[in-house]
């Protein structure tokens, strides 16, 4: 456990945000009570929590600090001629109607199906300007760490905790340890934040960040856009971390300015002044540190059944026989058996059946633009779904003609939603199929029973779409 700094010691941004939100300090026998600034909810993990509130006759403590959307189980196909949404089953439709009722009954602001602001929760929240530096942010979703890109302390919570926050606006939490990931150099052509985070997870392993909050530092991180920073923080959980964040700077402030929930006028100036004090103090110490050189990286892709099993697209499928640790060797053997891959064989050239471009990891406008760079003037050789992360992303992309590029390439341009990332809405792959996906998890069956997922960036996914196989996006863009 990181120790609380006294007033004279340099503090990390993690310490600063944590200390500012402690309602009751933790003890050896009890976790801290932490105040929550923003609670995001969606239709899958909130129904049970609202039911408990009803049963106990409770109201929301701070309804204005709760914001709702729909994303997990909603269709990404448009309404039918009868005006109805094509839900995959009755359960999905019931989740949506129950969400509408819950938000109406408890006074929660909801941006649901058909709303121009609706989107995947971790795309929608920042677009609304609801996510701001120095906040504590929670959501009943694993990838809430996305909001850490704004210098917020953001983490996923379980359904029972969703109920706790709705009723009290507080949460029981143990103070996390701190991990600094410093990234020197600069990402080369054809690389993005997705390649960087896959490389970091490959180095740390899926349990390397357990019990920690990661702060991403260094020139390569500072050079990222806000979209890139959100991608980076989004997958912190895949290294086992509780959360991940990037300290706010002018890039952050410029992105937030003018958004619906961002402060306005004099309040904006006051907020920016506060936010500028958030970055870690010079001399602040961390429990652990990791250093990488971005200029040494190549486009990444996963080959196995967890996000830590990643290699360069130019690399070879690892051989379990070279693994000294017996447990790690067994894990690798099982992964390759499920994936049907041969040790020592190049990953490039592996046949692909489906490509998915979207999700809370890579469903933003920058991701749509990157995919379009590869798709423009080419034809896809495999089924390809491009799913914007929100209606705002969709609208902006269509204004730029990206939808036309996607359709002319033979790919599908869909409505916003989680879609094939979690495959709850009918967007899935069949057993044995290979899918290059810009999402965040490649667990067995994640995209459909027996489906095989390879995680990659939008550029690498689009390169797979137009070649029908795993390919180096740099070579595709160069016309080779």
UniProtKB/Swiss-Prot annotation:
The chemistry this enzyme catalyses reads: (2R,3S)-3-isopropylmalate = (2S)-2-isopropylmalate
What exactly does this protein do? Catalyzes the isomerization between 2-isopropylmalate and 3-isopropylmalate, via the formation of 2-isopropylmaleate.
Protein name listed in UniProt? 3-isopropylmalate dehydratase large subunit
Q: Tell me the name of the encoding gene.
A: leuC
Q: Give the top-rank taxon of the lineage listed in the UniProt record for this protein.
A: Bacteria
- Which family would the database say this protein is a member of? Belongs to the aconitase/IPM isomerase family. LeuC type 1 subfamily.
Gene3D superfamilies, alphabetically? Aconitase, domain 3
Q: Which cofactor does it need?
A: [4Fe-4S] cluster
Q: How does it assemble?
A: Heterodimer of LeuC and LeuD.
- Does Nucleotide-binding appear among the keywords? no
Listed as disulfide-bonded, the cysteine pairs are none
What parts of the sequence cross the membrane?
none
Q: Which GO terms describe its molecular function?
A: 3-isopropylmalate dehydratase activity; 4 iron, 4 sulfur cluster binding; metal ion binding
Q: What Pfam families would the database entry show?
A: Aconitase
Any note on cofactor binding?
Binds 1 [4Fe-4S] cluster per subunit.
Q: Could you provide one GO biological process annotation from this protein's UniProt record?
A: L-leucine biosynthetic process
EC number(s) per entry = 4.2.1.33
């Amino acid at each position: 456990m990181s120790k609380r700094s006294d007033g004279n010691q340099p503090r990390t941004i993690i310490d600063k945000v944590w200390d500012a939100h402690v309602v009751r300090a933790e003890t050896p026998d009890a976790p801290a009570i932490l105040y929550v600034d923003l609670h995001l909810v969606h239709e899958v993990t909130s129904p049970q929590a609202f039911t408990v509130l009803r049963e106990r006759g409770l109201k929301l403590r701070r309804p204005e600090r709760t914001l709702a959307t729909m994303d997990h189980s909603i269709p990404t196909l448009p309404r039918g001629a009868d005006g109805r949404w094509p839900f995959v089953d009755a359960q999905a439709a019931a989740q949506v109607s129950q969400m509408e009722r819950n938000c109406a009954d408890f006074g929660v602001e909801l941006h649901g199906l058909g709303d121009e602001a609706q989107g995947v929760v971790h795309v929608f929240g920042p677009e609304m300007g609801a996510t701001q530096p120095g906040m504590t942010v929670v959501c009943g979703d694993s990838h809430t760490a996305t909001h850490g890109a704004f210098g917020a302390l953001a983490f996923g919570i379980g359904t029972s905790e969703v109920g706790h926050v709705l009723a009290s606006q507080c949460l029981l939490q143990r103070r996390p340890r701190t991990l600094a990931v410093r990234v020197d150099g600069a990402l080369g052509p054809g690389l993005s934040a997705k390649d960087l985070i896959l490389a970091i997870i490959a180095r740390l392993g899926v349990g390397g960040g357990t019990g920690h909050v990661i702060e991403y530092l260094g020139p390569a991180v500072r050079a990222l856009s806000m979209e890139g920073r959100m991608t980076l923080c989004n997958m912190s959980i895949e290294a086992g971390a509780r959360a991940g964040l990037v300290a706010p700077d002018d890039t952050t402030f410029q992105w937030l300015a003018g958004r619906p929930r961002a402060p306005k006028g004099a309040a904006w100036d006051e907020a920016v002044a506060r936010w500028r004090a958030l970055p870690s103090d010079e001399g602040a110490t961390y429990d652990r540190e990791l250093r990488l050189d971005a200029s040494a990286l190549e486009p990444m892709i996963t080959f196995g059944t967890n996000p830590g099993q990643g290699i360069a697209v130019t690399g070879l499928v690892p051989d379990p026989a070279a693994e000294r640790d017996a447990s790690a060797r067994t894990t690798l053997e099982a992964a390759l058996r499920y994936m049907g891959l041969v040790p020592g064989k190049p990953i490039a050239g592996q046949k692909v059946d489906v490509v998915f471009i979207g999700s809370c990891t890579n469903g933003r406008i920058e991701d749509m633009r990157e995919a379009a760079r590869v798709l423009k003037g080419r034809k896809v050789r495999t089924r390809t779904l491009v799913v914007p992360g929100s209606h705002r992303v969709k609208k902006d992309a269509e204004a730029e003609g990206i939808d036309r590029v996607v359709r002319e390439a033979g790919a599908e341009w869909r409505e916003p939603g989680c879609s094939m990332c979690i495959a709850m809405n009918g967007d899935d792959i069949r057993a044995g199929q290979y899918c290059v996906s810009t999402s965040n998890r490649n667990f067995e069956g994640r995209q459909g029973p027996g489906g095989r997922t390879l995680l990659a960036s939008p550029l690498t996914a689009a390169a797979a779409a137009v070649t029908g196989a795993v390919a180096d996006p740099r070579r595709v863009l160069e016309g080779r």
